[in-house]
Amino acid sequence: MDQRRNNSKPIKNQDPINAFIRAREVLIIGDNGEKLGPLKRNEAIQLAEEKGLDLMQVGQQPDGLAICKILDYGKFRYQQQKKNKEAKKNQVKVENKEIRLTVNIGQHDLVTKAKKAREFLEAGDRVKISLKFKGREIAYMDLGKETLDRFYKEIEDIAKIEKEAKLTSRFLDMYVVPKK
C-alpha cells in the first residue's frame, strides 16, 4: 500500500523530470530562457543540480532529441496549479431554470411568471418555458402556442429565443436566453 504522510493525492507526473527523462541526448534551455545546446542527459542533470534546480522535459523533436528546460519544478507546479485554479474560478456557469405554464393560465399569473423569468434572465441564466397540456388540451396546440407567444411578449425586451417551441410528450418547450 502506498504510504503518504499528509494523506494528499499522489502526484500525477505529466512532465518527465531529472532521471525520468528517457532520451539519451537533450537540448537544454537555461533557467533564463537561453539555449545551451545539446548535451547528454547525465551532464544536463548534473548542470541543473549544480544550480540547485531540476531538469524538465518540455518537448520532443522528431529525431528523438528531447527538449528540456532547467527550472525549479516545485515552483513550476505551484504556478501551474494556481493558473488552473484561476481558470476554473473564471469559468462561467450557465444554469437552466424552468417556468411551467398551462394552456388556460390567467393573465395575472402569466405576468407573475414572466417577472420570475425576468429575474432569472437578469442573473444570466437560460430559461426553459414549459407549457403542460392536461387531458384533452393537447388537441388545442394553437392555444398553447398563443400562450407561449403572450409569455414571450412580456419578456422580449431582455430575452431572445434560443430554441423555438417544440412538443415533447405533453409539454410544449421553448428556451430563451438573455440578450447581450
Curated annotation (Swiss-Prot):
Top-level lineage group: Bacteria
Q: What is its main location?
A: cytoplasm
Q: Which GO terms describe its biological process?
A: ribosome disassembly
Q: Which Pfam families match?
A: IF3_C, IF3_N
User: What subcellular compartments does it reside in?
Assistant: Cytoplasm
Q: What does this protein do?
A: IF-3 binds to the 30S ribosomal subunit and shifts the equilibrium between 70S ribosomes and their 50S and 30S subunits in favor of the free subunits, thus enhancing the availability of 30S subunits on which protein synthesis initiation begins.
Say yes or no: keyword rRNA-binding present: no
- Say which family it is in: Belongs to the IF-3 family.
> Gene that codes for this?
infC
Query: What is this protein called in UniProt?
Result: Translation initiation factor IF-3
